[in-house]
């Protein structure tokens, strides 16, 4: 992706970047400009408990699945603390939930994605989610391992580029002024966000040619 290309110096002599996606827009509109997107952090989570026979001696086990369930409920309870302006999204799946129904699950694994509109918002939401995960493990008496990785940074469109693009579209293609969606904020993410943190960038969506 663009992060690796950036790391290797592929953008060292580039002053600005424009990215275009094709999309059916409708409602008489043909192009979106001023597109801003969320950034995200990914988490690989492992809850570690202790196996035991689920019928004979469940009291001897430490149920990792219960830790994960509590952690998810903790995350849900946190949602009202996420500010609307940050467009926070927390998505989670259990990728490994135990081996046998007759055995108290000793290891449960999850994948989590935390999205937000700003870097500060990403860090704040990520910290809260980690707290929720740790609380789930603590309540049952087990352990949790959290491996955080930065995905994409938030996409911040350069408004001057957007204005210039619109002006040229109207002049050279005959586009109508009201055919543009001028503020398109999405909770999705794009690797163009990383570039937008260091140079002027623009991300447009347009219908077919």
Which residue ranges define each predicted feature?
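Histidine/acidic-residue-rich, glycine-tolerant segments that coordinate divalent metal ions
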Residues: 1-105, 189-190
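Metal-dependent amide/peptide-bond hydrolase catalytic core
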Residues: 66-209
């Amino acid at each position: 992706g663009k992060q690796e290309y950036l790391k290797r110096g592929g953008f060292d002599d580039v002053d600005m970047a424009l990215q275009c996606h094709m999309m059916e827009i409708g409602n008489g509109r043909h192009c979106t400009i001023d597109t801003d997107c969320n950034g995200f952090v990914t988490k690989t989570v492992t809850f570690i408990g202790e196996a035991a026979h689920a019928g004979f001696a469940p009291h001897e086990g430490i149920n990792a699945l219960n830790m994960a369930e509590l952690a998810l409920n903790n995350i849900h309870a946190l949602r009202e603390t996420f500010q609307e302006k940050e467009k926070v999204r927390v998505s989670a799946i259990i990728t490994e939930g135990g081996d046998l129904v007759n055995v108290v699950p000793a290891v449960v694994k999850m994948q989590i994605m935390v999205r937000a509109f700003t870097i500060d918002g990403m860090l704040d939401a990520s910290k809260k989610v980690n707290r929720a995960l740790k609380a789930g493990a603590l309540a049952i008496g087990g352990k949790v391992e959290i491996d955080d990785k930065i995905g994409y940074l938030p996409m911040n469109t350069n408004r001057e580029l957007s204005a210039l693009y619109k002006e040229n579209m109207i002049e050279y293609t005959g586009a109508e002024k009201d055919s543009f969606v001028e503020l398109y904020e999405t909770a999705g993410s794009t690797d163009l966000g990383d570039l937008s943190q260091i140079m002027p960038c623009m991300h447009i969506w347009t219908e077919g040619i």
